[in-house]
Amino acid sequence: VTLGVIAGIKKGSGIDIFSMIFALVGQSVAPVWLSLMLILIFGVTLKVLPTQGMGGFQYMIMPAICMGFQFTAITTRMTRTGMVDVLQEDYITATRARGISKMKVYTKYALKNVLLPVVTVVGTQLGNLLAGSAVIESVFSWPGMGQLLVTAINSRDLQLVQSLLLVTAFVIAVINLLVDILYTFIDPRISLS
């Protein structure tokens, strides 16, 4: 979010160009390919990170990068686009004309309106993270819900498949509820009723 805000404020600058390239690459690269490249570079060639299994913090670095790279790119692009649009609105120009500091204009007035669509995208992307975890868990040999679901499907254990899908649906429903509650904190005009 921070990179998107800065890129939106400094439209056309080096930071903006970097954020747009990052967003383009992040949305284009498949997490499976990224995970294989990270294993090849940091696990096999440089031998600085473990390639599979679970243990300490260092075992989580590559899977976290793989799962968060696309998520971060989408969020950065959405924030930047929203910030550029909001900063061109008339009320932002009027707020600046009143002599309010730039930082207050960005944080209090512009960011509040940018965050609503960003929170929506983040909520839907968290569901996508759950769905994509099966592939990442398989690549890094992590014993997680995603890999358990794949194993249950392959062994035709229907009760386990139904249970895992029910848990996943419940988690996604809770995430959507939290997104709706978060809306009321961002914009008090929105009510939960």
Segments predicted by a language model, with ranges:
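Alpha-helical transmembrane segments of integral membrane proteins
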Residues: 1-15, 44, 54-193
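Cytoplasmic-entry segments and transmembrane alpha-helices of multi-pass inner-membrane transporters
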Residues: 2-38
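Extracellular/periplasmic helix-loop junction at the C-terminal end of a transmembrane helix
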Residues: 31-55
